[in-house]
């Protein structure tokens, strides 16, 4: 038979265990949510494979750089690995990622007189857009050059000018698509606005002429 003291101890222990179980359940649930955010991002993407490779090469280059600072003595090997990753990233983003994720594409051609000509292409603005693809593309496009700039500042502080040269190459390769797609996006918005204005003007003129015709000949 329980005494009053035993009952109180039992209740206190039960409450303590209940709180611990609840906290553990919350912790596990939070860990599961955090673990599922990245896969969920790819699940919500319209082009998960393109999104994966869009992030893979540029992230791999930064990871290789940071690990190489501590775990390798072969700077030339590291330079080749990072340069290869960023070169593949440059081609992939230019020809695949931008077209699939945000409906934009750019290229640069040389004219007859040797002049550099930028050509921007964009998908139909009425095409359904995926918010995950859009946000990830634009955030990553500006974030990664910024990360390389920070790594460059660290190299300057540590007087590692050989590493700084590698960072300069990385900034150059990652900034090409950043600058090109920024111009491509502005050009697309300008053309869409012009086409919309022309369409509205044409519609206004058509309505005006129709009303004038009806009023003149029909009354």
UniProtKB/Swiss-Prot annotation:
<comment type="similarity">
    <text>Belongs to the TVP23 family.</text>
</comment>
<dbReference type="Pfam" id="PF05832">
    <property type="entry name" value="DUF846"/>
</dbReference>
<feature type="transmembrane region" description="Helical">
    <location>
        <begin position="137"/>
        <end position="157"/>
    </location>
</feature>
<keyword id="KW-0472">Membrane</keyword>
<feature type="transmembrane region" description="Helical">
    <location>
        <begin position="62"/>
        <end position="82"/>
    </location>
</feature>
<feature type="glycosylation site" description="N-linked (GlcNAc...) asparagine">
    <location>
        <position position="95"/>
    </location>
</feature>
<dbReference type="GO" id="GO:0005794">
    <property type="term" value="C:Golgi apparatus"/>
</dbReference>
<dbReference type="GO" id="GO:0016192">
    <property type="term" value="P:vesicle-mediated transport"/>
</dbReference>
<feature type="glycosylation site" description="N-linked (GlcNAc...) asparagine">
    <location>
        <position position="34"/>
    </location>
</feature>
<feature type="glycosylation site" description="N-linked (GlcNAc...) asparagine">
    <location>
        <position position="108"/>
    </location>
</feature>
<dbReference type="InterPro" id="IPR008564">
    <property type="entry name" value="TVP23-like"/>
</dbReference>
<dbReference type="GO" id="GO:0000139">
    <property type="term" value="C:Golgi membrane"/>
</dbReference>
<keyword id="KW-0325">Glycoprotein</keyword>
<keyword id="KW-0812">Transmembrane</keyword>
<comment type="function">
    <text>Golgi membrane protein involved in vesicular trafficking.</text>
</comment>
<keyword id="KW-1133">Transmembrane helix</keyword>
<keyword id="KW-0333">Golgi apparatus</keyword>
<dbReference type="GO" id="GO:0005783">
    <property type="term" value="C:endoplasmic reticulum"/>
</dbReference>
<dbReference type="GO" id="GO:0009306">
    <property type="term" value="P:protein secretion"/>
</dbReference>
<feature type="transmembrane region" description="Helical">
    <location>
        <begin position="161"/>
        <end position="181"/>
    </location>
</feature>
<protein>
    <recommendedName>
        <fullName>Golgi apparatus membrane protein tvp23</fullName>
    </recommendedName>
</protein>
<feature type="glycosylation site" description="N-linked (GlcNAc...) asparagine">
    <location>
        <position position="200"/>
    </location>
</feature>
<feature type="transmembrane region" description="Helical">
    <location>
        <begin position="41"/>
        <end position="61"/>
    </location>
</feature>
